[in-house]
Amino acid sequence: MANEKIRIRLKAYDHRVLDQSAEKIVDTAKRSGAKVSGPIPLPTEKSIYTILRAVHKYKDAREQFEMRTHKRLIDIVNPTPKTVDALMRLELPSGVDIEIKL
């Protein structure tokens, strides 16, 4: 796997869990001898939902809810087979979405 790059995108609603997962991935990759770039914080996606609190009229009585999606990017340059194997066996929390591109 010479001159290749693994790009890992992490998404989560809780930034603390996301940072812990990114740190685990970076430590695992560095221990196996690969060069790591990141974690790079990407822009946070914010979704706002507005609903009416009243049942019939009263348009002034509204409530807003927001959902923030935090993202991180990690690049692993020149991964060894040992690196790929270690990343496959890594246990991460269930609240983190992982997208891997080779």
From Swiss-Prot:
Alphabetized SUPFAM superfamilies for the sequence: Ribosomal protein S10
A GO CC term assigned to this protein in UniProt: ribonucleoprotein complex
Keyword Ribonucleoprotein in record: yes
Keywords in alphabetical order: Ribonucleoprotein, Ribosomal protein
Recorded GO MF terms: structural constituent of ribosome; tRNA binding
PROSITE patterns assigned to the protein according to its UniProt record, in alphabetical order: RIBOSOMAL_S10
Keyword Ribonucleoprotein in annotation: yes
SMART domains found in the cross-reference section: Ribosomal_S10
Superkingdom of the source species: Bacteria
InterPro entries assigned: Ribosomal_uS10, Ribosomal_uS10_CS, Ribosomal_uS10_dom, Ribosomal_uS10_dom_sf
One BP term from GO: translation
Pfam families: Ribosomal_S10
Summary of the function given for this chain in its UniProt record: Involved in the binding of tRNA to the ribosomes.
Protein family per UniProt: Belongs to the universal ribosomal protein uS10 family.
Subunit description: Part of the 30S ribosomal subunit.
UniProt protein name: Small ribosomal subunit protein uS10
